[in-house]
Regions:
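N-terminal, active-site-proximal structural segment of metallo-dependent hydrolase catalytic domains
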Residues: 1-68
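Active-site catalytic loop in hydrolytic enzyme cores
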Residues: 2-17, 105-179, 197-201, 260-270, ...
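Active-site-proximal beta-strand/loop segments in catalytic clefts of secreted hydrolases
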Residues: 27-30, 74-75, 99-102, 127, ...
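Cys-nucleophile CN-hydrolase/nitrilase-fold catalytic domain and related Cys-dependent amidase chemistry
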Residues: 41-125, 190-193, 197-202, 207-208
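Structural motif
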Residues: 68-69, 157-159, 182-183
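CN hydrolase (nitrilase-like) catalytic-core segments centered on the catalytic cysteine
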Residues: 85-97, 168-286
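A short C-terminal boundary segment appended to hydrolase-like catalytic domains
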Residues: 265-313
Length: 313
């Protein structure tokens, strides 16, 4: 049953002028490389050296490549690491969608997504409960959130976050006003990516002024299928170049890039003023999505990255 008892806040992040172009980094974790525990019928990540090494590796790559915003998958960032990420964001003028963590709230738990800006940390709540988070006991499991937000006047534009199953709630997305959003972030831990892709394609097509959707999903065997991705519209000839290199198979059409199973991240730039390319092109109509850095096997970045986080020798 969908949760209908929630509010949508308007958060004015700053008075900064929006950047015409931003660099984004999607991070993808592999569950088996990290340590987990079950607490009150909820799967929670443990704050260990393995996780710390991965976070440091990601943030080092982000810093060295001038990233403006990072997104991590659902359940990947424990509350104990949020303060460290905020210090990093403040020092590097960066935005971080810091996955989610569970917080005890009354008899049960709330799922919190920290939206970290250079100025402060905002909290939004996951609104709807997935089948894996429910429990027959009143003091266990996740019982649904009460508050989410639209973020305005930020350097990366107007944006919102829908955590995993919340993205499938059309009523919630209607209250977030998709036509006013420039970016939608979807941190996730799910094994039905095809269903998410279908909805993302529709939402990008239906956006009047154009919108990019950034999807960061956990890779966890049968529980979560990875396939983190970026959705947006492009001129056909530009998108064809991505098809040739295997960045996308256009299934569906507005899928611009899908991370492979052995990828941990991708960095790309987005033209925030050309979110919906028109058919009427001119000499200034370029490419609104550009790949900056991939950890692809061809240049051994996967090996170097895994070595850095001590997953391999």
């Amino acid at each position: 049953m969908l949760n209908t008892h929630y509010t949508v806040r308007n958060e004015i992040v700053s008075t900064d002028q929006a950047s015409p172009e931003i660099r984004c980094m999607i991070c993808q974790f592999v569950k088996d490389e990290l340590d987990w525990e079950e607490v009150d019928d909820l799967l929670m990540i443990r704050n260990t050296s393995k996780l710390h090494n991965q976070i440091v590796a990601f943030t080092d790559v982000a810093k060295s490549n001038g990233v403006d915003v990072m997104i991590f998958p659902e359940c990947s960032i424990p509350e104990s690491l949020v303060e460290d990420l905020y210090k990093f964001a403040a020092a590097n003028d960066m935005y971080i969608i810091a996955g989610t963590h569970y917080k005890k709230s009354g008899p049960a738990y709330t799922s919190i997504c920290p939206v970290i800006t250079p100025q402060k940390v905002y909290e939004i709540e996951k609104i709807n409960v997935s089948p894996f988070e429910d429990s027959p006991y009143p003091n266990k499991g996740f019982k649904g959130g009460r508050s989410t937000a639209i973020f305005r006047n930020s350097r990366i534009g107007t944006f919102a976050v829908t955590v995993c199953i919340d993205f499938m709630n059309d009523e919630l997305k209607g209250k977030l006003g998709l036509n006013d959003l420039q970016l939608l972030f979807v941190p996730s831990f799910n094994n039905t990516t095809d269903n998410f892709y279908e909805r993302m394609d529709i939402n990008v097509n239906d956006s009047r002024m154009g919108m990019y959707i950034l999807y960061a999903n956990m890779k966890a065997g049968n529980s979560a299928d990875g396939c983190s991705a970026i959705f947006g519209q492009m001129y056909t000839d530009m998108r064809n170049k991505l098809v040739k290199t295997g960045a996308t198979d256009e299934r569906p059409q507005n899928l611009l890039y899908r991370l492979k199973d052995d990828q941990r991240y991708v960095i790309f730039s987005l033209d925030m003023q050309m979110r919906k390319p028109t058919r009427a092109r001119n000499i200034y109509s370029g490419c609104n999505f550009k790949i900056v850095k991939e950890d692809i096997a061809e240049d051994q970045e996967v090996y170097k990255f895994l070595k850095c986080i001590k997953v391999t020798d």
